[in-house]
Amino acid sequence: GFDNAKYLQMQSQHIRERIAQFDNKLYLEFGGKLFDDYHASRVLPGFEPDSKLQMLLQLKEQAEIVIVISAQDIISSKVRGDYGITYDLDVLRLIDAFQGMGLFVGSVCVTMYTAAPEVEAFEHKLNSVGVRTFRHYKIPGYPNDVARIVSDEGYGKNDYIETQRPLVVITAPGPGSGKMATCLSQLY
């Protein structure tokens, strides 16, 4: 079967090596569920439902979490099917859960930013409790118009997310939130 302890040790070591390889800054897109990945534990016997979280906890002194959420998901009040809560409320739940485990949440990035009262209220709520917010904008032609994407009209328009730690974990309440685009924008 799957050796969970060996997995945690090897993955953590590999991430440390990557951080050193990339000038002490690594952006790591974390998709899927961090707290309760029962699907992975079903298809991979021996994989614990919280293995990803346990790996992060081994790196917590180096790690900073950035949570991304699409403006459209805020505006439409998109609901997580598993928890029955909206994505914006899930961001608040994730912040509390990460902080409760001793992990540092550096900021929240609103992706595909659109000015709307719901988005402004969400940003205000986060700022009022000390969570910094950043904005990434819609890029016409994304993902096919590479020349525009990697220009001042593309990633260059986005806020640069100021981070403090060498491992920046980009996560989100659900798929399609812009995790990978956020990583790429930071590199730009």
Describe the residue ranges of each PLM region.
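N-terminal pre-Walker A segment at the start of P-loop NTPase domains
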Residues: 136-156
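Short, glycine/acidic-rich beta->alpha junctions
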Residues: 48, 118, 162, 178-182
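Long, basic/Gly/Ser/Thr-rich N-terminal segments
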Residues: 1-141
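Pre-Walker A (Motif I) flank of P-loop NTPase domains
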Residues: 24, 164-168
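Pre-Walker A adenine-sensing motif
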Residues: 13-17, 151-163
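Glycine-rich phosphate-binding P-loop
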Residues: 167-187
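Glycine-rich phosphate-binding loop of ATP-dependent small-molecule kinases
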Residues: 1, 158, 188
